[in-house]
Amino acid sequence: MAAAMSDPDREAAAQGTMDVDGLRVRLVDVDAVTFTAAYEVVCNANLWFVHHGLFDATHRPAHDHRFDAAWASYRHVNVAMADAVAKEAPEGAVVLVQDYHLTLVAKFLADLRPDLRCVHFTHTPFTDPDGLRMLPDAAATEMLAGLGAHVACGFHTQRWADRFVACCTERGVTAPPTFVAPLGPDPDDLASSAASPAVATASHAITALAGGRRLVVRVDRIEPSKNIVRGLRAFDLLLTEYPQWREKVTFAAFIYPSRETLPEYLAYRQEVTSTVAWVNDRWGTADWVPVVANLGDDYPTSLAALGAYDVLLVNPIRDGLNLVAKEGPLLNDHDGVLVLSSEAGAADELGDAALVVNPFDLAATAEALHRALTMDNPERAERATALRSLAAAHSPHTWFDAQVAAAEPNGP
């Protein structure tokens, strides 16, 4: 069950419950104005920024009555979802509620269908008590109380669970039991996708792009939390501090636009493209483009790049998990090295086999890139083998099963 996000979705919602690939699917129709206020203003422009630590506190947030109106829309969407679940769910069913968009559903379902057992899973990081103060007090407390109405709340890492509990404690909200269930790729599905003709064609293009040079790769949405600009600046610092890498390494960035209704995202895209141009103007030669940026959403090419990297840079400011950090090692056949932000949830699983960096430290990131590029083959192979094992340890199936298990009377 999901909210209808577009006019075609709303037309589909009018058909009621549908059968899609053997699944019963229902789209819940919420009017466009209400949905936009809830999704764009509350979720994308506020909750996402709070949980990822993205606000520039000198200027934002600055809440007024417009946020209050948007929060009422957020509440309305959650009520609509609760009403729909109440009508569809069998007696005593387990309801798995996903992410920060729907933190209030269980609170409303408790009155409508007390027989249902609701489990919430947060895919993002969870902010700490200081970060939560960047929301209006009433909204923050209502959100926590809504999460507290679940029989359990799940997170990708223990540190996000601990932050949630700390927020509840500070505001006098009783936290439900929490559990940790890291999501992972499906290795078989990933391998099947990588074996497609489109990926084979893209692999030839990646080989030509590298031109015999070492290859640093990143695959991301153009999203402030992904820290793309600092990654580019760290690459510039690598070329400054270690001139032996000039004309010997190419940074291939497969980055695609996201949430361009938000001014921060439009500005960040401009900053990314201008930084790419700056690095290339500074170091490029007639025969070498230091940074090759592909701004299209090209999944086959992204898979091909993940199969070919010598170094994979994943340096988010904060990330609930980051699946690319797991997909890369599973796809890569070069014993590629992973340079990974300590603030990615995946670092809690992969950190021993990756080169972990502070995402704000350009010098440390540049040094990690140099270390990765100069690492001897036995260490590369050892780390790559460990990464493959760790990345495959959790699958979509184990993640799903953990949520269902958390709904059982003995809990997580």
Pin down the residues of each PLM region:
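Catalytic cores of carbohydrate-active enzymes across secretory and cytosolic contexts
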Residues: 1-412
